Amino acid sequence: MTDSGSAVRDSVLSTIGTIAQGASRFAYTVIVGRLLGADVLAATNTAFAVSILLSLLGPTAAGNAAAAFGGTGQTGRLTTKALTITMVWLSAILGAVALVTAHLLGGGGASSLMVAALTVSWSWYIFGRGVRFGMRQVPAVAVWDNVTGALSLVLLVAVILTHMTPLVLAPAVIGYGAFALASLVGARRAARRHDSEERPAPTQALAHFLIWSSLGLIATNGIMQVSMVFAAVFDSPARAGLFAAALSLATPLSMLAQAVTPALLPQFAQWSQLPHADRARSIRRATLTLTVLLGAGAAVVIAVLPWALPIVFGQDFAGAVPLAQGLMVAVFGFSLSVFLSAYLAAIGRARISTLATGTSALVGLMIMIGASIGLGGAVGAVIGTGSAMILSASLLAAISLWPGRKESVR
């Protein structure tokens, strides 16, 4: 199979797996909202937001690095080993930060511990996906996404039926943890089959990638997660619950770019070696394709939301419809930004990408604060996030097609 054909196959399989995991996450929130109410849904989605936000401080970038630079080759295996060691202490630190953050947001001891556990589990899940992608084990990712997604839903139903509401996050913790464990075990087995004399991993290039990729991910993804926390802090629990339902419906589309991007990182690395004209043609074609797919998906979702949302969550959540429709604009820009940021990082232009996304995030945050003063935290979160993501996607698209000097990684 050609490199392009392999990339397409990997993208399709990656998307299938992430759709399965995204569907299980969506079903998770629907079950919580339907059976436990808006207040518990708001708390649950806020916990997910905190976990994902903290994972942007290294684990997500480590997963991307494992996908881009890992593999079964000698240097790739050593790179994965170095990243795994980094993840051990990094996840411990982020778990402690999550514990404190959850407490500051009003969580009790048990709920704060669950948020910390979710942060650690999610961080290893994201890293495990990257390890699998780096070793070209994309079919395994799809299989385990399906298995662990189903496992988390079964456990969630069991938790609710046994009236153990304080443990509502435990099924997600177990599901993500099981995926991560399977990924690391699979990677270890693959490494044993390719034993050879070790040599130092490219630590300078790896550190550069981790730092700038993390900054770029925070700037790009952070505003989406901050919006949930913002709505929970600056609006009533009921309104925050409506925003949580809206965000739950908007999230699956955003996962498309997140699913495709890791599988394309090796292809991005190859594009970085091409002449500018060829590279620009490749990214232009890929960006146009993704834009059409995302635009069509967003339009369909916006059209069906007025009747679909009340059916899914119940009539009590009908007020979330305009919030969800507004968030679809944000998700459209977010998905393009994730894709383009990963491309720019892979070709050595992470700094200018981070500057663009960071500026967009700051502008969006200011708009979010201003709009919330008169319209409330939930509406302010929608307006601010949408503004940030559209500005980010526009700037990144312009940068991606602009002749630029490749940044040094030394």
Model-derived segments and spans:
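Helix-loop interface residues and adjacent transmembrane-helix termini in multi-pass membrane transporters
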Residues: L35-A38, M135, L161-H163, F234-P237, ...
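Interfacial segments at transmembrane-helix termini and the short loops linking adjacent helices
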Residues: A38-A42, A102-L118, A303-F332
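Helix-loop junctions and terminal segments of transmembrane helices
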Residues: V30, G58-Q74, A246, A250-L274, ...
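Transmembrane helical elements of multi-pass membrane transporters/channels
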Residues: D10-R25, T148-S152, V168-A190, R199-P266, ...
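Membrane-interface junctions at transmembrane-helix termini in multi-pass inner-membrane proteins
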Residues: T72, S121-W144, V329-G358
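Membrane-water interface segments that mark the loop-to-transmembrane alpha-helix transition
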Residues: R9-R25, A47-G106, H276-V300
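Signature of the first transmembrane helix
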Residues: G5-T60, I211-P237, L365, T385, ...
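Hydrophobic alpha-helical transmembrane segments
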Residues: L113-A116, A142-R192, T359-V363, G377-W402
